């Protein structure tokens, strides 16, 4: 049975993996006959209009709701406005979502990322099944949601987490629930990287230069490589303060042959078949850039952070090193450079297997199965008091007794 599905999206932009992944899922659902509506916060920025137009071209309707803050109060993003204005905004957003559910006869609500709760509450009020897709580890900037897992459990018929380390961690924290899995998906069109014999060997790392991406670790390992060593190339924009840290280390240790290319619309067009890809991230939710590298047939070395491990468990391609162990990383790079031709041939030979494992259908199979079977879910008891969440109730005048008390107090002050 085909369904009307309402997605609650975190930003209404295509500059993050969670949004990119879910748009691909929404597109697939439309192609298979479902009707998809997408709710986003309206921040009145041009990039959101591009996002809305892109989704409209895929037959996905987007509804932008004015919002003081779309995410939980203690989620990243600060505290814009006053406590009263945020509370009112949450109420109005929840009310607007409830109206969409009833007027559009929505069959299922899916909240994409842990950071929004309005869709879960609206679904509970209107007796509509709700699925929650969690991309974030409950640590660091997203550690705030660990104490909200009871709410997440109470207001979700099904909970999904990125497969691997995150799924296992949440399963331990939600021992009374079955946490299901998915993997983020991005469309990858392998780039023609040219013949490997026509380009110089290089070490490349694609991605924004940030403390979390941890490229300084690669710079330090590069400084320890055996001579002669190939060029090290970073492709991606950067955070200014972190770039200064890298520049300072390079200058103080007189490290040569490192270049920073900055942002490129198609970073993989800068890569050649003679390149070795290295990703030293300290933390990732999922290793999308690692997947892009192996789907371009590049020999790859990656740190063993939980997000990388989650992706590695699917493909088992490339070489892992212990995050933070600079000596081990240097050894892995030296060995990979010495055996590059064999690693390259192996990477190219495995491309067919990798492409078969990474499709929308395969990474979202469990979710797709559950979407087809939402009829048996138990209603949430919040529906019995949903009138308390209405925002269109008329303001009540104070009773005559209360007015007399107020007047008495005021006259006492004047006396």
Where do the PLM segments sit?
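Glycosyltransferase donor-sugar binding loop
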Residues: 39-47, 206, 231-244, 260
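Short glycine/serine-rich donor-binding loops of glycosyltransferases
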Residues: 267-268, 287-290, 308-309
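Short hydrophobic beta-strand element within catalytic cores of glycosyltransferases
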Residues: 299-303
């Amino acid at each position: 049975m085909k369904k009307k599905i309402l997605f609650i999206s975190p930003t209404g932009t295509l500059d993050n993996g969670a949004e990119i992944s879910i748009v691909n899922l929404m597109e697939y659902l439309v192609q298979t006959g479902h009707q998809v509506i997408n709710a986003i916060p309206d921040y009145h920025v041009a990039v959101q209009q591009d996002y809305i137009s892109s989704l409209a071209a895929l037959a996905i309707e987007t509804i932008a709701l004015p919002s003081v803050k779309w995410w939980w109060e203690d989620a990243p993003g600060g505290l814009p406005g006053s406590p009263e204005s945020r509370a009112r905004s949450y109420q109005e957003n929840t009310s607007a979502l409830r109206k969409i559910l009833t007027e559009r006869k929505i069959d299922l609500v899916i909240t994409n990322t842990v950071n929004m709760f309005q869709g879960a509450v609206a679904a509970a009020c209107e007796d509509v099944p709700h699925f929650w897709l969690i991309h974030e580890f409950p640590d660091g900037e997203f550690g705030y949601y660990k104490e909200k897992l009871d709410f997440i459990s109470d207001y979700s018929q099904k909970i999904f987490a990125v497969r691997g380390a995150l799924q296992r961690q949440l399963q331990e924290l939600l021992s009374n629930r079955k946490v299901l899995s998915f993997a983020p998906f991005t469309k990858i069109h392998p780039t023609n990287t040219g013949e490997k014999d026509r380009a110089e060997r290089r070490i490349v790392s694609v991605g924004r230069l940030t403390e979390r991406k941890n490229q300084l670790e690669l710079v330090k390992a590069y400084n320890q490589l055996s001579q002669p060593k190939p060029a090290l190339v970073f492709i991606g924009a950067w955070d200014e303060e972190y770039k200064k840290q890298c520049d300072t280390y390079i200058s103080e240790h007189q490290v040569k042959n490192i270049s920073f290319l900055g942002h490129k619309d198609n970073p993989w067009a800068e890569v050649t078949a003679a390149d070795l890809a290295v990703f030293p991230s300290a933390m990732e939710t999922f290793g999308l850039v690692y997947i892009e590298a192996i789907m371009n047939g590049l020999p790859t070395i990656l740190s063993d952070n939980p997000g990388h491990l989650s992706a590695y468990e699917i493909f088992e391609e490339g070489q892992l090193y212990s995050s933070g162990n600079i000596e081990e990383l240097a050894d892995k790079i030296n060995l990979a450079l010495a055996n590059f031709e064999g690693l390259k041939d192996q990477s190219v030979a495995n491309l067919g297997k990798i492409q078969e494992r990474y499709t929308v259908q395969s990474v979202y199979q469990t979710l797709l199965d559950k979407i087809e079977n939402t009829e048996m879910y138990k209603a949430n008891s919040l529906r019995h008091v949903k009138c308390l969440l209405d925002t269109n109730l008329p303001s009540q005048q104070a009773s005559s007794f209360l007015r007399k008390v107020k007047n008495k107090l005021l006259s006492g002050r004047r006396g």
